[in-house]
């Protein structure tokens, strides 16, 4: 049986990083077009016109079943992304700031999960969606910044990988 730590390599981290970007992007796009088909949202260019939100396209059945399933798979990929980064940097003996980075990354995953769980209508759902997405974005930005600084400062350790 292959040990988990031996499976964690730069190539696998690259694949997980790409999947963690592509899967939620495709999920949102497909959910958007399905929401248009079911008349939950109007056709527009959301990035330019601001006519709908990601929450709105994944809120109503049957689209929300598709949306939530694939977003939870995305959350799992993001979780793996943080695990892989932590193990790769731990192999090099860099633990001090990376423990904080890992902790914030995992917190962001937890709050992203809360955001997905609380998709729905009403003030109760709206409150938890806003809290979940705000904290997710905040912790993601901070943890990615710390991760980038860690890799940049210690880039000489990763030259041969």
Which role does the model predict for each range below?
Residues 108-160:
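Membrane-proximal helix-loop-helix units in multi-pass membrane proteins
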């Amino acid at each position: 049986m292959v040990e988990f730590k031996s499976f964690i390599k730069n190539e696998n981290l690259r694949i997980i990083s790409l999947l963690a970007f592509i899967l939620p992007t495709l999920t949102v796009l497909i959910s958007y077009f399905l929401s248009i088909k079911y008349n939950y949202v109007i056709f527009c260019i959301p990035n330019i016109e601001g006519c709908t939100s990601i929450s709105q396209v994944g809120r109503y059945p049957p689209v929300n079943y598709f949306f939530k399933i694939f977003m939870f798979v995305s959350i799992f990929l993001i979780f793996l992304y943080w695990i892989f980064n932590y193990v790769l940097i731990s192999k090099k003996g860099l633990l001090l700031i990376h423990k904080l980075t890992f902790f914030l990354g995992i917190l962001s995953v937890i709050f992203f999960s809360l955001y997905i769980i609380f998709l729905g209508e009403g003030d109760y759902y709206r409150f938890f969606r806003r809290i979940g997405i705000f904290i997710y974005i905040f912790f993601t930005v901070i943890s990615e910044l710390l991760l980038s600084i860690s890799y940049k400062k210690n880039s000489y350790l990763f030259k041969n990988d």
